[in-house]
Amino acid sequence: MSIFKKLFDKIKNLKQKKSNSENILLNDGVKKNSAVNFDHGLKKTNNFFVNSLNKIIYKNVIIDDEFFHKIEETLLSMDVGNYATNKIVSAIKNEVKFQNIDNPNLIKQIIIDKLFVYYIQDTIVQTNLNLKANETNVILFFGVNGVGKTTTIAKVANFLQQNNLKVCLVAGDTFRAGAVEQLDLWAKKLDIKIFKPTKPNQDPASVIYDGVKWASENKFNVVLCDTSGRLQTKTNLMNELKKINNVIKKFDPNQPCESLLVVDATIGQSGLIQAKCFSEVVKISGIVLTKIDSTSGGGIIFAIKDNFNLPLKFLCFGEKVEDIEMFDLEKFIKVMLKNFSFLEEE
């Protein structure tokens, strides 16, 4: 049995433990060239990861402390993070000792298995959006300035439309100049309804409350709420986000169904600081990683899940509205291991 088969069976067994017939299951297969997009989006991460591991394995004739130190350096360079890296390397060491392996070329499967099983651990990797049938589902997007939040919302909206859901947008970013116009432009391109502020400098919480109410009255399946980019150090803006979350719950205690933090993948471990600060204000349900094609640090997914147990919901790359993928661990594994010389193809 190949490593792919073993890992995928573990993943599928975990997924099968969680099934809710009330949830809307999204299908990434509605998109064309999904596998190609994953390859493109994670190319830098794949190249760095595979090339680094191959060099370590082929340049070391024995398994010693230096060998494990080089693996540790590779994981840290991928933004896996100190804690996760130490745990993963320790697990690799223990397995190598247990199997009494002394040939570096024989531990490739162990390295990969421990890396990705660590991501799964004993938890269920719930990457599907928590959307309920016959309800107006509210998804709140937030993050710091410049992460590509508004474009991400357009990408998610397009993806949901491809899943035959009735989607609308709420322009809650009343602070940034041109933000409402930018979202409105996307709405027109995608032929999606949008709720905009009714007066200049309107309180964003009131815009979102009115927008969610309007979406519910018009029987939309999903309403995507844009918010102003905010630095986690600005107390007043963070309190504003808390207020926005509260007014949504005032309309419906079960909403928002998803509160998604949008993070720029190129900032590496700084994303952990952002996640920590935002999680103190709003209960984050998942992460959207943008600009994943511009970095070799795809290992940040391990650090985020390790520190906050937050699932990755979407990967974004490029400027096109189609440049988005639901996070799929099976696809992620295949791309991360592409061209790893010993692996047999399924």
Language model: regions and residue ranges:
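Non-catalytic terminal/linker segments enriched in charged/polar, low-complexity residues
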Residues: M1-N128, K132-L140, N158, Q162, ...
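P-loop/Walker A NTP-binding module and the surrounding RecA-like catalytic core of P-loop NTPases
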Residues: F116, V125-E346
